[in-house]
């Protein structure tokens, strides 16, 4: 199969998959695997090659990004459980000030959601939003929209969250995550600007229950602080995120400048995503020790793996679909037509 028929078949397959997940409540993993198998047969991939295509697509994702996703999730869990994420949020509030609470919430969400899953980030930061709402009397809706926008922007664009890592692996740039981080941060800027103005716009037109029925929301924030006891210092709160980024930047710099010798080898070693995030995890473990929560590290790891497991399998199933699409010649067809259009 080739040409327009290939594109139409692909569109129909994606539509069926979306319906299967959203309407028929089929597990995303099974939906992706099933559609991949059916698509492989329909587009004419030789039957003898289909098992190998599925296997290579699945294992390729695990080999390129699986460990990176696990390490990033572990770092995020540690930041959440030690209060480091809360410390990061407080640092942002001090930087921005309380006169623009919606901007503070947006930046907080953007920073915290880099290592922490966006849903957990919302749980962590929502008490701060409520506390700022009580102090500033600013629109609760505007602050919530800004927070959500910040959380989702970095979650979608910036590693080590699974989505951008998976995209990097599919595009063959999984070993250059620093570039993905930089490009994701750049793309985030216009997104955050638009979201900021939209939050202000919608906040003037809609009132939430928080504003209609005021309650003692600041108490939740105080209780949250008490549950952590003393928050980590600023350096240790940011180190598990910042150190891996610096390591990956060093590795990219070594490649770009053509370094050679032992220094280049060492720079590229610590700059590889797996090693860089392992170093970040080591700083996270030190943070756990300082917080007196080292004994709970095993439980944290187990809980994190339970959360990450389904994400890994769904991501790997997406890799299978990508491999089927590539093997069917869809990518080559798009390249040929793009080249023809450019001429």
Question: What do these predicted ranges mean?
Answer:
Residues 1-10, 62-68, 120-121, 188, ...:
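Structural signature of hydrophobic alpha-helical transmembrane segments
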Residues 3-4, 182-300:
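Long, contiguous bundles of hydrophobic transmembrane helices that form the permeation core
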Residues 6, 32-39, 65, 69, ...:
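Alpha-helical transmembrane segments of multi-pass membrane proteins, especially transporters
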Residues 6-18, 25-45, 66-72, 236-249, ...:
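Hydrophobic mid-bilayer segments of alpha-helices in multi-pass membrane transport proteins
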Residues 19-30, 134-142:
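Membrane-helix interface "capping/anchor" motifs
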Residues 46-135, 291-343:
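Membrane-embedded alpha-helical segments and adjacent helix-loop junctions characteristic
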Residues 73-75, 109-126, 138-204:
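Alpha-helical transmembrane segments and, especially, the helix-loop junctions at the ends
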Residues 158-167, 250-260, 328:
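Membrane-helix interface motif
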